[in-house]
A protein has these predicted regions:
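Conserved catalytic cores of phosphodiester-cleaving nucleases, focusing on short active-site segments
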Residues: 9-35, 51
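Extracellular structured ligand-interaction cores
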Residues: 6-8, 15, 59, 123
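Amphipathic coiled-coil/heptad-repeat helices and related helical stalk/stem segments
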Residues: 4, 44-47
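A short acidic/basic microdomain associated with nuclease active sites
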Residues: 1-4, 10
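Metal-dependent nuclease catalytic regions and adjoining charged, substrate-binding loops involved
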Residues: 38-40, 50, 54-167
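A short acidic, glycine-rich active-site loop
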Residues: 33-45
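Short, mixed charged/polar active-site loops
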Residues: 4-6, 15-17, 70-74
């Protein structure tokens, strides 16, 4: 428990917190190559930092299995790659008390080469995405398109996608 937030770690190995993850090949490579800090849409580093704070440790890591190949890796992030979890939790708790949404967590990213802009993954699963981006597409809000790989939320449509729009 950290600042009133409860979590459940997976295990400790040699006295250090270890979070066990199964990952796609793409996500597995972020752990294996040590590039998770550059793109951590699920907040894994914050999760680890929270477990470490609660346990009084600071050299934890992730034991990750590639779901496609069964390959394993152990990734121990640098301290500077982990957020100050007390500050992060306090900031989020303060933002939850606001009458209006906080600043956007993520900025839209290009979708292909024709000028369309979409929400990044970290924003796509958020239940507030429509509220945060209600002014997208010249005030019409987010436009949702169904691709074979799932839904894409466009903030700016320059070229109409050749897939079904979810209305």
């Amino acid at each position: 428990k950290v600042n009133g937030i409860v979590g459940h770690m997976d295990c400790k190995i040699n006295g250090e917190v270890v979070d066990v993850k199964s990952a796609s090949k793409f996500a597995f490579n972020k752990f294996q190559n040590g590039t998770l800090a550059a793109d951590d849409p699920f907040g894994y580093l914050g999760q680890l930092a929270g477990y470490e704070e609660a346990e009084g440790t600071d050299e934890g890591g992730f034991l990750v299995i590639n779901k496609e190949s069964g390959e394993l890796c152990m990734y121990t992030p640098d301290d500077l790659d982990k957020p100050n979890i007390n500050t992060k939790i306090n900031t989020l708790l303060d933002e939850l008390k606001l009458d209006k949404p906080p600043e956007l967590c993520y900025t839209p990213i290009p979708d292909g080469k024709k000028g369309n802009m979409k929400l990044p993954k970290g924003c796509s699963w958020c239940k507030y995405k429509h509220e945060c981006h209600k002014d997208a597409n010249d005030g019409a809000g987010l436009r949702t398109f169904k691709y074979s790989t799932g839904y894409t939320y466009l903030t700016e449509v320059v070229a109409e996608p050749k897939v079904d729009e979810v209305l």
